[in-house]
């Protein structure tokens, strides 16, 4: 897939060893690669967005620019499907993305399901346009990672990809339930929107989640 990559999403702990076989991804996506996490926490920024929402293109552009400026932060765009009934069907949307948004909000004691909405790690939704976002990311980046992750990916016959993961908890720095997710995202996507609030616009997207696997509950 053009510009595709894997990233870890969600709260992480261990021990865990898991393997996945994914169909339909191009051979170029992962001929053979390995990755291991470092000691510093890599903040996760989740943008919940939709092509049918006229306030979302600005947030999409912000995420694309931020991902280029700050590659040590994990940026993910989850396109939600609850806008699909309002004039335009988002081809990148999935019901699982809206369900994840709802779960994340409930775990943070919040209820407002809106787009665009940005959640950073275990913090409550934050205004992506404000100074609080930069401060939160800076503070998060100085923290020590609570888990060690190792991942390898290799191309398989028939256009399939094998992904192997191992996770190990380092100490007791994770409070509450620990879940492991795996997300495949794609960059450089474009859509000519023909209906709905963004009719007539060419929308450009990066870090779009195309496959979400998990969660694995870690005891």
PLM segments and residue spans:
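N-terminal export leaders
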Residues: 1-12, 118
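Compositionally biased regions
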Residues: 5-6, 20, 27
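Bacterial N-terminal signal peptides
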Residues: 11-24
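Active-site-proximal cofactor/substrate-binding loop regions of enzyme domains
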Residues: 29-114
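Short, conserved sequence motifs used for protein processing/export or organelle targeting and
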Residues: 89-219
């Amino acid at each position: 897939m053009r510009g595709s990559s894997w990233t870890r999403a969600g709260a992480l702990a261990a021990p865990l060893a898991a393997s996945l076989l994914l169909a339909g991804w191009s051979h170029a996506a992962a001929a053979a690669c390995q990755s291991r996490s470092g000691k510093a926490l890599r903040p996760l920024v989740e943008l919940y967005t939709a092509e049918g929402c006229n306030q979302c293109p600005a947030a999409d552009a912000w995420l694309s620019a931020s991902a280029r400026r700050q590659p040590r932060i994990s940026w993910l765009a989850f396109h939600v499907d609850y806008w699909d009934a309002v004039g335009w069907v988002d081809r990148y949307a999935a019901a699982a993305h809206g369900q994840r948004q709802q779960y994340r909000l409930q775990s943070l004691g919040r209820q407002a399901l809106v787009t665009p909405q940005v959640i950073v790690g275990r913090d409550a939704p934050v205004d992506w346009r404000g100074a609080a976002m930069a401060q939160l990311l800076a503070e998060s980046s100085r923290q020590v990672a609570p888990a060690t992750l190792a991942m390898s990916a290799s191309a398989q016959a028939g256009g399939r990809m094998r992904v192997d993961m191992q996770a190990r908890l380092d100490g007791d720095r994770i409070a509450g339930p620990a879940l492991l997710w795996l997300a495949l995202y794609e960059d450089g996507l474009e859509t000519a929107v023909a209906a709905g609030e963004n009719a007539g616009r060419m929308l450009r997207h990066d870090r779009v989640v195309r496959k979400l696997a998990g969660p694995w509950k870690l005891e």
